[in-house]
Amino acid sequence: MPIQNNLQKFNDLRKEYPVFVYDSYHYEIADNGNLVVSFSFFVGNAIRYNPIVYIKKHSLFDDFYTSGNLEKLQDFVFSIGMIELLSYWKSTCSPIIEVRCGSLDEEAVSFWKKLYFNGLGEFFYTNSIEISIDEMVTIVPQLFTSAKKHFFGLKDETIVPIGGGKDSVVTLEELRLAKPLIPLIINPRKATLETLKAAGMDGNFLEIQREIDPVLLELNAKGFLNGHTPFSAMLAFYSLLLGVLSGRKNIALSNESSANEATVAGTEINHQYSKSYEFEADFRRYVKRYLSDELNYYSFLRPLSELQIARLFSQYPQYFSVFKSCNAGSKQDIWCCNCSKCLFTFIILSPFIAPEKMREIFGENLFENPSLLYILQELCGLTAEKPFECVGTVDEVCVALAQTIKKYEKLPVLLQYFAKTELYTKYAAVDLNEQLRHFEPKHFLNELEINQLIDKINKLQR
């Protein structure tokens, strides 16, 4: 991720645009049965944003729509607006956010400030902006009160968001053995739809179509501030809304323990902050305090590492030809084979899938590409930063590389490089089977899920 010195631009924009306003939210059931959600944000007189989201019609929503409880969605939609606004606020980084709808108390304001600050850690870093959480923004609510919690009588069934990569495949396959579930997709693409087809679930899923206001894209083109925002936090709030609409209380994410590691060594800057245990714990407290005691948002894979997930995924060959984790190639539904996400995925799966099959999945053997050497060094912790992508820990990458070397008679160029480092000597001695049986204690799984996962990983062998 290129670092740009935009500190002066940051300061200038904050002076020119001192107040960002969250003016209103609106939702209604359209004639076609979709729930249409919209927000109104503005900055001064010149910049107005009106993003729109479509919750696609589904028969599971019928009971809620006929219950007369539509007004109970207000606090959920308001909260979605609080996370949606971040994509627009970051263009000007206005020092004040004025909230003219909904209600927030002091604890809620603290939650949002922490989420904004940590969720934008990468954004601030890559724009060379050094600022404290107190200096970043002041949130001024119109109503400084607590929201009212709601009861819906939700079923003990589960929504599983599907991203098209290996992690959500593992969650889907493991959870479907134990309880009824339904997949959720935001902005479906070929990989997500093909994943559901391979699972035999393509005829029944929940769908959200989210649109970015084109005004934001115009500002980006004009040189306003731009960068990473915490997508997984946005997904978290949308999944709550879908839980209420569908009458399901559980939302099972696929965020693993590896997401807790900082992206920049020696700091708390984490590309995956909104996938971390810290965010998950904060979010659950927010939901219980302000929205509903019934909803259970958690990550089913939290006790596991990327290495363990890769091993589990290797047991589902029906997904090999359809899963895609490459952001650069997502629109074309390809592995670009030239980015950190592609190389990481190739590395983490290689101990468990034969080289010939890996070449078939990716279209080439990425270990043979010398132009990926610097990315390899980033993934191995040989640089100050890991890639700003959803990748595993340095330890996991090094263990996977050391194990993969044992599978080759003639080493490709990237494995040759790693074999000559001190890292190889260190990680070649690691017991892979012991790594595969580790169970991270910080999680929110119930006892049945704990036993299910422990039983599964105890049976894992290379």
Descriptions of predicted regions:
Residues 1-157, 174-215, 224, 247:
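RNA-binding accessory domains that recognize and position tRNA/RNA substrates
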Residues 2-39, 46, 289, 293, ...:
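ATP/NTP-dependent adenylation/nucleotidyl-transfer catalytic domains that generate, transfer
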Residues 61, 187-321, 331:
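ATP-dependent adenylate-handling ligase core
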Residues 87-99, 243-251, 350-360, 405-411:
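Short helix-capping/linker segments at secondary-structure and domain boundaries
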Residues 157-162, 170-172:
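Core alpha-helical transmembrane segments of integral membrane proteins
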Residues 167:
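Hydrophobic/small residue at the entry helix of a nucleotide-binding pocket
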Residues 170, 234, 238, 340-347:
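Short amphipathic alpha-helical face segments that pack within enzyme cores
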